[in-house]
Amino acid sequence: MEALAPGRAPRGRRRAGASGSVLSPLSLAAVLLCALLRAPPAVGHLARLPRSIHLTQDSLKIVGSTHFPVSVYVMLHQKSPHVLCVTQRLRNTELVDPSFQWHGPKGKLVSENTTAQVTSTGSLIFQSFEETMSGVYTCFLEYKPTVEESIKNLQLKYIVYAYREPRFYYQFTARYHAAPCNSIYNISFEKKLLQILSKLVLDLSCEISLIKSECHRVKMQRAGLQNELFFTFSVASIDTEKGSKPCTDHSCEASKRLSKAKNLIERFFIQQVEVLGKRAEPLPEIYYIEGTLQMVWVNRCFPGYGINVLKHPKCPECCVVCSPGSFNPRDGTHCLQCNNSLVYGAKTCM
């Protein structure tokens, strides 16, 4: 015999009694709303943040290599690390009369530049990195190892990429015991459920989107056929300035708001089981099937950006600007091949 958790309704359980107990749409919503209103505040734990790197600390310094171009990742609109015009070996070596000269995608860089500054010691620093500033940067170093020795020349290449954090969202799937698949009650229930979920996360500046809702007849083990609703929806954070209640403090970070929304949704479905388990009346025609709530984490990038672990192993979960020869027209996570693309961050393949 199957062991059931307290208050759990068997998946194949039918309505008790001979009289019909199909609830009206408003009554169906009342059952869900009861669970919502009784739910305690969600436990505040953070969602797993993408393991991307944050290269905006002033103390972080990047050195070059004479063997291969060094990749540098700068978060969009942020300050870059110090890109040094030396190798790791020369960094700890005394240099006599050093001379530094930097060239970027648009030509020679000068110390007076407001967006890309060259310090007196040859370090390159970006103050507010823009997507169009991505590209190859070359430093020409001229120095003497000692006063007596002749001048040596060194050329170091860096590929500087703009990157952004993924705009992830959660996708949920839940199953409900349903009325006959052609019943209007299923449609009414779906609309009311979406309204309740949307209201649940409204104050967190998150939005609920229906992905699909399908009704199927399912053959149960050692039982007959029953109708089930397969309900798939997503929850994503929206820009706080676009929300009904603009928010600017630290708690308004998208990942924190989305984590709280996820907790509220999970608690909402748990409460549905608890409420039904305490009912003295027969089960309604439509009710949540315990244990069927599934959740997956879905990443998405802005157009012109993509995730590529093989190409960017130092920034494996960053949405890195698409390199020339590739593009991303939508919010997918991959830059697609396009031989005609000649710029960084291409959104179309011309």
Swiss-Prot record:
* Subcellular compartments: Cytoplasmic vesicle, Secretory vesicle, Acrosome; Cytoplasmic vesicle, Secretory vesicle, Acrosome membrane; Secreted
Any signal peptide, and if so, which residues?
1-44
Domain of life the protein comes from: Eukaryota
Naming one, the record's GO cellular component terms include: zona pellucida receptor complex
Instruction: Give GO BP annotations, semicolon-separated.
Output: acrosome assembly; binding of sperm to zona pellucida
Q: How is it modified after translation?
A: N-glycosylated.
Q: Is Glycoprotein one of the keywords UniProt gives this record? A: yes
Q: Report the record's disulfide bonds.
A: none
Give the principal location in a single coarse category: cytoplasm
Q: Which UniProt keywords apply?
A: Cytoplasmic vesicle, Glycoprotein, Membrane, Secreted, Signal
Q: In which tissues is it expressed?
A: Expressed in testis (at protein level). Expressed in male germ cells.
Q: What happens when the gene is disrupted?
A: Male mice are infertile with abnormal round-headed sperm morphology and no forward sperm motility.
The entry annotates sugar attachment on: 113, 186, 339
The UniProt entry lists membrane topology as:
Peripheral membrane protein
- Which family is it part of? Belongs to the zona pellucida-binding protein Sp38 family.
Q: Which PANTHER family match?
A: ZONA PELLUCIDA BINDING PROTEIN SP38 (PTHR15443), ZONA PELLUCIDA-BINDING PROTEIN 1 (PTHR15443:SF5)
Q: What does this protein do?
A: Plays a role in acrosome compaction and sperm morphogenesis. Is implicated in sperm-oocyte interaction during fertilization.
Query: What is the protein name stated in its UniProt record?
Result: Zona pellucida-binding protein 1
Q: Which organism is it from?
A: Mus musculus
Originating gene = Zpbp
